[in-house]
């Protein structure tokens, strides 16, 4: 049957082998990992136990990402994988799984911030003109600015580079989607330090 998710092959705590009392069972079967890469969308449907269907994403290029402090979600392009706590090989091959840290395009979030508050964050492209808002819209923006949470310094720097860090919260090999949330605050600091450590370890 191939891959099996049983525990009969495991040894005892003392190191002895368990006697085999039965063969592999259909309900214990496992499948090859999806190893989702960055590229044009390619999702396959897999029939699973009970006649249910799973979506196995083999390639994805974008996903929905939530900006927690602003309560805003947008579709954004996935650029590359930068950190994976479990396996460096998945970073090298740009393979993304649940919990890995990726870089995404900052443009949708920068546009939202500009439209919502009238404040431009991040780098400007050559030829970009100041968009003029109507008086009514400008008044709304002023009111929003009064209750606005101050922007985290770490995320401000990332907006300047045009790339944001995000964590994948969905399971691309099970749901066929790569959705997640932006890293900010203490979590962003933690992963920035972890990435620096891995870079230094790689150089030495």
From Swiss-Prot:
Protein name: Small ribosomal subunit protein eS8
Encoding gene (name): RPS8
NCBIfam families (UniProt xref): eS8
Pfam families cross-referenced by the UniProt entry: Ribosomal_S8e (PF01201)
Lineage: Eukaryota, Rhodophyta, Florideophyceae, Rhodymeniophycidae, Ceramiales
The keyword 4Fe-4S is assigned to this record: no
GO biological process: translation
GO cellular component, one term: ribosome
UniProt record similarity statement: Belongs to the eukaryotic ribosomal protein eS8 family.
Keyword line: Ribonucleoprotein, Ribosomal protein
An annotated Gene Ontology molecular function: structural constituent of ribosome
CDD domains attached to this UniProt entry: Ribosomal_S8e_like
Domain of life: Eukaryota
Keyword Ribosomal protein listed: yes
